[in-house]
Amino acid sequence: RRHTRLQGDWSSDVCSSDLGCDPLVYLTVGTGIGGGGLINGELMHGLIHPEMGHISIPHHWDKDPYPGSCPYHGDCLEGLAAGPALEGRWGKPGNELPPEHPAWDLEASYLAEAVATIISILSPHRIIIGGGVLEQSTLLPKIRRLVDAKLNGYVRHPSILDSIDDYIVAPGLGNKAGVLGAFALAENALESPAHL
């Protein structure tokens, strides 16, 4: 069977050209950290798929003696900020930590480092951040506040200076974004068998 036409308003998360925000980066923070990008309507791909979770970020050893949970790099972004790192550092999963817990300031700092790096390297028109860890409602606003400080005046663009709430956003589809994006990719592959 090949009938896979999707219904509903899912294009906001999977069709960046429809929003006029191409290039776009999507970062997901859950049991791991993954990321992808669209440039000219095409998924970024090189030697392998992007491994945004394994970028190196400054480890705040003075505030955070946790060595990191990544089996490859220890304290890469994923090793410091994914769900297993939250649980390893604080002794309980993120969904059991209250909004005022110090975990969220540290988490926001690490994720803001990553977002600032992504902005410096790819200069996307929008960054979407989702995943289970971002279900903590105080986290995304903290990340936004820290990104400009991490950039330290280097990127002086109205998207960051004047409308960062529209530049760094949660997925419009919430936790359904990943599965609907996978359906959209499958549908595109079926419509263009050369990509199979």
Language model features: what each stretch is:
Residues 1-10, 14:
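Single conserved hydrophobic/aromatic residue that forms the stacking wall/gate
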